[in-house]
């Protein structure tokens, strides 16, 4: 099963560190995949949830263990063109990633290609899913 850290969080939410490149690198070094929030402004990539915060290079996003959530349409188009694993959604309950995974809310129907996003606990995971994304991903090891 793919274990995905939500914005770099491993054992609980640390909002002030989320999407910080060093925080993300730490989660990657511990062996987790990481979901990050990506913006593109004036042809430059940034990380940040509510706004662009951390300027990054395209090469950072090309890590195969990153799941890049495009926060604006420019970021989505640029990442698709650069063959970076990404997805885009606003109010949708399920989003299709550029590698064919279903990024799905816990309450939704799951398949073998589904990533279960933010389940209430590690004991409540649906059967036969591809992976899970959580602020508490360390509890799933």
Q: What is each residue range found by the language model?
A:
Residues 1-141:
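Phosphate-group recognition and catalysis centered on beta-loop-alpha active-site segments
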């Amino acid at each position: 099963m793919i274990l995905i850290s939500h914005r770099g969080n491993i054992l609980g939410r640390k909002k002030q560190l989320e999407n910080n490149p060093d925080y993300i690198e730490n989660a990657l070094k511990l062996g987790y995949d990481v979901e990050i929030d990506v913006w593109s402004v004036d042809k430059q990539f940034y990380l940040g949830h509510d706004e662009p915060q951390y300027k990054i290079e395209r090469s950072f996003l090309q890590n195969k263990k990153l799941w890049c959530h495009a926060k604006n349409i420019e970021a989505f188009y640029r990442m698709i063109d650069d063959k970076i694993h990404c997805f885009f959604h606003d109010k949708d309950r399920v989003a299709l990633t550029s590698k064919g995974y279903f990024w799905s809310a816990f309450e939704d129907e799951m398949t073998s290609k589904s990533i279960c996003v933010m389940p209430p606990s590690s004991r409540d995971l649906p059967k036969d899913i591809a992976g899970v994304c959580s602020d508490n991903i360390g509890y799933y090891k």
